[in-house]
Amino acid sequence: MIDFGNFYSLIAKNHLSHWLETLPAQIANWQREQQHGLFKQWSNAVEFLPEIKPYRLDLLHSVTAESEEPLSTGQIKRIETLMRNLMPWRKGPFSLYGVNIDTEWRSDWKWDRVLPHLSDLTGRTILDVGCGSGYHMWRMIGAGAHLAVGIDPTQLFLCQFEAVRKLLGNDQRAHLLPLGIEQLPALKAFDTVFSMGVLYHRRSPLEHLWQLKDQLVNEGELVLETLVIDGDENTVLVPGDRYAQMRNVYFIPSALALKNWLKKCGFVDIRVVDVCVTTTEEQRRTEWMVTESLSDFLDPHDPSKTVEGYPAPKRAVLIARKP
C-alpha cells in the first residue's frame, strides 16, 4: 500500500496545511475505489525494490543515482526486472544504478527548452499538473525547488514515481498525488505551476487555465506547454474523432490564440518562449515502451501531417504571471 502520511506530515507544517481539510478524505476515497486490475502487481514491484541510498545523485543534469560500489549483476537484474514490470515507461529517461530506462519521450529535451526561461526555482513550492511518472519534478528539485507536488490520476504513473523515489533514497522533496486538477480546492499556494501536455486533453481549456490560476500565489508563475498550430489569434483546430490517433484531443490553438486565452483568464506578462515540431527522435518506441509511438501516428508519405491529415504535432511553451 502506498502511504501518503509523509506528505500529510510535511504540509501540516507549511503554508499548504489548509489542504488537509479535504485531501486525506479524497485519498481515502481513492484507496477504497481505485485498483486498476494490475495495481497490486505494480505496487508489489515497488515494494520488492531494494532500499538504496545513492552515493551520487544528479538531479540537475539528469535523473541519475549511483552507488559507491557497483551493484552485483544479480542486484542490477533484480532492479531491471521489477522496473520492467512497470512498463510502459513514457516520461524519462532515468539512470538508476546501472539500469538505464530509455523512455518513449526524451523529457530531458523538453526540460532543456523550458528551464532557461523560468524564474529561479530555488526555494519554490511547485505544482506539476499531469506530471506522469514525475520525471520533471525531480528536475525541478535539481534546479533548487524546495518542494514539488505532482498530480496525475493514472495509477501506473503513481507506482513508477514511487519506484524511482525508492531508488533515490526515499527522497521526500517530491510527491505525487493520484488526483486531477478539478479535485483540488483553490489553494493559491504554489510559486510556480506547470501544465505540460495537458491542455489539449481538456474539454474546456479556459476552465483549465482558471484552475491553474487558482493554485498560484499572487505574482506566481505559470508554465504552460501544449500542442499548437500555425495561425493568427483567431486560429483554433478542433479535431474530429482522433488527432494523431488520440481520441481525447479537443482544442489546439495557435500560440497567439493561446496568449489571448491566458489574457482573458487574467494572466499578465505572457510570453511565448519556445515553439518546436515534435520529432521521432524525441518521441519514439523503445525497449521500455514497445507499443505504437509518434512515427505510427504520422502520414507515412508526408510526415508533416498526422495519419488523419492534420498538421503534425507542434508544441509551444508559454510563461505567464498571476498578478
UniProtKB/Swiss-Prot annotation:
Its EC number is 2.5.1.-. GO terms for molecular function: transferase activity, transferring alkyl or aryl (other than methyl) groups. GO terms for biological process: tRNA wobble uridine modification. It holds the Pfam family Methyltransf_9. Keywords: Transferase, tRNA processing. It comes from the Bacteria. Carboxy-S-adenosyl-L-methionine binds at residues 91, 105, 110, 130, 152-154, 181-182, 196, 200, 315. It is an enzyme of class 2 (transferase). InterPro entries: CmoB, Mo5U34_MeTrfas-like, SAM-dependent_MTases_sf. It catalyses: carboxy-S-adenosyl-L-methionine + 5-hydroxyuridine(34) in tRNA = 5-carboxymethoxyuridine(34) in tRNA + S-adenosyl-L-homocysteine + H(+). Catalyzes carboxymethyl transfer from carboxy-S-adenosyl-L-methionine (Cx-SAM) to 5-hydroxyuridine (ho5U) to form 5-carboxymethoxyuridine (cmo5U) at position 34 in tRNAs. Homotetramer. Belongs to the class I-like SAM-binding methyltransferase superfamily. CmoB family. This is tRNA U34 carboxymethyltransferase. It comes from Shigella boydii serotype 18 (strain CDC 3083-94 / BS512).
